[in-house]
Amino acid sequence: MAVKKIVQIGHEALKKVSEPVKDVNEVKGLIQDLKDTLATVEGIGLAAPQIAVNKRVVYINFGDGENEYVLINPEVTGVSKETYEDYEGCLSYVMHEGLVERPRAVRIQALNEKGELKVYEAQDLLARCFLHEIDHLEGIMYVDRAKEMYELVEK
């Protein structure tokens, strides 16, 4: 489809709770837009609100050939009691990062591109990525959860 502009912090789409997808066929183009857009930037995840579409769709791709996920209407169904802090960044708030505490492990369920219900269990970076992107669907950015924020400088 097309590479879309990634909206930045303060944009209305990033503040809204996104609408559930009723039919996966209605978001095929959106999914391709997310894939095309993420391929052009240095990031591992992109949620539909980040391209100004308030639908509950997330695309994650670690670029390793193994960790690629399309999540439609994702729901967190379980989290570990153990948490840890790590730094997060966001394509919608470039040149910044923040220290965020998140559960070490998570279980989510979501529809895939074919409309099949899948359950995923993840730890560490993948769990953090799932939660970060699902937050976007709730109108939450990592800066809302960060204990500390830093502005990055270019070399």
From Swiss-Prot:
Its EC number is 3.5.1.88. GO terms for biological process: co-translational protein modification; translation. The keyword Protease does not apply. Fe cation binds at C90, H132, H136. Pfam families: Pep_deformylase (PF01327). It comes from the Bacteria. Binds 1 Fe(2+) ion. Keywords: Hydrolase, Iron, Metal-binding, Protein biosynthesis. InterPro entries: Peptide_deformylase, Peptide_deformylase_sf. It catalyses: N-terminal N-formyl-L-methionyl-[peptide] + H2O = N-terminal L-methionyl-[peptide] + formate. Its cofactor is Fe(2+). The active site is at E133. GO terms for molecular function: metal ion binding; peptide deformylase activity. It is an enzyme of class 3 (hydrolase). Removes the formyl group from the N-terminal Met of newly synthesized proteins. Requires at least a dipeptide for an efficient rate of reaction. N-terminal L-methionine is a prerequisite for activity but the enzyme has broad specificity at other positions. NCBIfam families: pept_deformyl (TIGR00079), PRK00150.1-3 (NF001159). Belongs to the polypeptide deformylase family. This is Peptide deformylase 2. The gene is def2.
